[in-house]
Amino acid sequence: MSAKEVKFGVDARDRMLRGVDILANAVKVTLGPKGRNVVLDKSFGAPRITKDGVTVAKEIELEDKFENMGAQMVREVASKSADLAGDGTTTATVLAAAIVREGAKSVAAGMNPMDLKRGIDLAVEAVVADLVKNSKKVTSNDEIAQVGTISANGDAEIGKFLADAMKKVGNEGVITVEEAKSLETELDVVEGMQFDRGYISPYFVTNADKMRVEFDDAYILINEKKLSNLNELLPLLEAVVQTGKPLVIVAEDVEGEALATLVVNRLRGGLKVAAVKAPGFGDRRKAMLQDIAILTGGQAISEDLGIKMENVTLQMLGRAKKVMIDKENTTIVNGAGKKVDIEARVAQIKAQIEETTSDYDREKLQERLAKLAGGVAVIRVGGATEIEVKERKDRVDDAMHATRAAVEEGIVPGGGVALLRASEQLKRIKTANDDQKTGVEIVRKALSAPARQIAINAGEDGSVIVGKVLEKDQYNYGFDSQTGEYGDMVKKGIIDPTKVVRAAIQNAASVAALLITTEAMIAELPKKGGAGAGGMPPGGGMGGMDF
């Protein structure tokens, strides 16, 4: 085991604070509508330009191990805020740095760090309660657009695209962001349920121009196993022919004489039919087939349930107003499933999302949820160069998460105003002793940091702006750094999602309180005598890799 270096007390906290400040200073320049860009060097390809706080934070690694520990702890604040609310990462970082800075001064002055932490916790509880109390539900499409615009750094086009997407797919629908191949940003909405499997044979095509199958008012057979034996299909096919309606078969595969017969019947015009392979694999396939069954009001035919193919009746088939199948995708629109059943399935998937620990599983479950609940909207972000597209895509991602958060928990005035107003409430908090009171005071001072930083980035005097905003007793009154005017922030469309602001202060205080209560730090001693690789003579070509 290699030797370790140990730092104590003031020395440890000073080193840590230096790391916190370096990270916070790099991140805070991006805050607000007049925040600046940060350029990140990439080991391959062009540098990346971004205004996204968490992206900047993730790039920072410091040489000094103790400084780096401080920086990494605050980086955790940004990451946690990004995970929880998807935005507010810069605000969280600025708050954390402010709390740590004030807290370190108090500890140096001889106050009890544990009491300071208790005071900080009390203050955060009061701030969250105040945010929730003053939160306003998002009602109109315009408000969603405003949230998106603010989060995308004042880009109204992005706000409008997101509002349109949410209007079309609903709050539960999935919105994905991709890079476009053109200059224009565009919105593409897939209504109904779509899965990535196309027709098994091109002979099923009904629209030769578009090379796709289009059926109206179709029956849907959902089968888990392969279909190769014609005899077991015959009774069902005859029943469907009697109704004169088209049939879509979703199965693991359709092959052999079953496929040949379906194709021949289709070509002769006796039977409107198409077959597609079931989506997904293994257990996920079972779940997706069950989703399709619930959406269309049918039954997933499975031998586990003891249902044999030859015993399937028309009542077991799903129904849909429209089914479209092309070479790669199948879309089912307006399935005949009961609303109650669909809602129960949605609730079940939501519960699984809460419980899962795997990001991949969560993503797949969210896709399934969207397909059942609303649909999928794709925003394709355009731009003149690859660097511009990437930078814009970052902002669209942030804005998308912010609009989601706004719909979930409502909105508060933006520009750091909600936190400023909450800071006034902290003057009334009763504490057990003076050290706890100082903890509350630390948070009260820190709450003005985001508003101050937004003003500084806009070239204004932060302290003057904060003072003027606090003079007025109106909750929504604040400073619009884009125009340089004071006024009602909500009316001006400068709003933040409550969830984003709440997550920012909770995460910032949580990590900052841990840093303040740190008394010792341990890190590996730097290796002496360069980075020669073990067992290799100096200059052996591999040593420090200095080519």
UniProtKB/Swiss-Prot annotation:
Record-listed ATP binding positions: T30, L31, G32, P33, K51, D87, G88, T89, T90, T91, G415, D496
Function recorded in the entry: Together with its co-chaperonin GroES, plays an essential role in assisting protein folding. The GroEL-GroES system forms a nano-cage that allows encapsulation of the non-native substrate proteins and provides a physical environment optimized to promote and accelerate protein folding.
Gene Ontology MF term list: ATP binding; ATP-dependent protein folding chaperone; isomerase activity; unfolded protein binding
HAMAP family per record: CH60
Top EC class of this enzyme: isomerase
EC number: 5.6.1.7
Pfam families, per database record: Cpn60_TCP1 (PF00118)
Family statement drawn from the similarity comment of this UniProt entry: Belongs to the chaperonin (HSP60) family.
Keyword field contains ATP-binding: yes
The name this protein goes by in its record: Chaperonin GroEL 2
Subunit (UniProt): Forms a cylinder of 14 subunits composed of two heptameric rings stacked back-to-back. Interacts with the co-chaperonin GroES.
Protein's gene: groEL2
GO cellular component: cytoplasm
Catalytic activity annotation: ATP + H2O + a folded polypeptide = ADP + phosphate + an unfolded polypeptide
Swiss-Prot/TrEMBL GO biological process terms: protein refolding
Compartment(s) where it occurs, according to its Swiss-Prot or TrEMBL record: Cytoplasm
Tagged with keyword Hydrolase: no
NCBIfam families tied to this protein: GroEL, PRK00013.1, PRK12849.1, PRK12850.1, PRK12851.1, PRK14104.1
Keyword annotations: ATP-binding, Chaperone, Cytoplasm, Isomerase, Nucleotide-binding
